[in-house]
A protein has these predicted regions:
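Active-site anion/phosphate-binding pocket segments in diverse small-molecule metabolic enzymes
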Residues: 14, 83-168
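Active-site-proximal beta-alpha core segment in soluble small-molecule metabolic enzymes
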Residues: 1-91, 95, 99-100
């Protein structure tokens, strides 16, 4: 992954350490976006205490650089994006930058379901990244039960390997 990806989404310190070790072996520093769970229970650190614990440990991983925070909503736990749960990323970025000296610039506010907040002009300032692959590739926002204008919905089928799994 380190060889091919220019950044990765991470949730577990064990995986972050392994990524760091791989990056060091390759003479690289691999950028990571730390995922924060805001209630959907799909992925990410859960709660400020767990976030602080993992942030301190990331400082000891020389092969990675924490460049962003992200969240995923509208998936497993049916939590939809809101001004409140996306604003959490802005608040946590400011906290981590201040307390730990990170220079977090990327705030990844979700998937195609977050587009609705953007379209309505309600996406909090500071959210500067959305992972809209489903929208681009499949032409849909499944949580809003809508098709995205101008996109095809039958372009291909996709298969992938699961590389991280955790029970919450």
């Amino acid at each position: 992954m380190v060889r091919w990806a220019d950044c990765s989404l991470q949730s577990q310190i064990e995986v972050i350490r392994a990524v760091s070790d791989a990056a060091v072996r390759q003479g690289k520093i691999h950028p990571i976006i730390l995922m924060v769970d805001v209630g959907d229970l799909r992925e990410g650190v859960f709660g400020r205490e767990q976030l602080e614990e993992i942030a301190g440990q990331i400082l000891g991983c020389p092969g990675v650089e924490l460049v962003g925070l992200g969240t995923n909503v509208g998936c497993y736990g049916s939590i939809l994006p809101s001004v409140e749960n996306t604003r959490v990323l802005v608040e946590l970025r400011d906290f981590l930058n201040r307390k730990y000296g990170f220079h977090i610039k990327t705030l990844s506010g979700g998937s195609p379901c977050t587009l609705k907040l953007l379209e309505e002009g309600r996406l909090p300032a500071g959210i500067n990244h959305l992972r809209v692959g489903e929208g681009l590739l499949y032409g849909e926002d499944t949580t809003g039960m809508r098709f995205l204008e101008g996109y095809h919905t039958d372009a291909f089928h996709f298969k992938a390997q699961v590389v991280e799994l955790r029970r919450k």
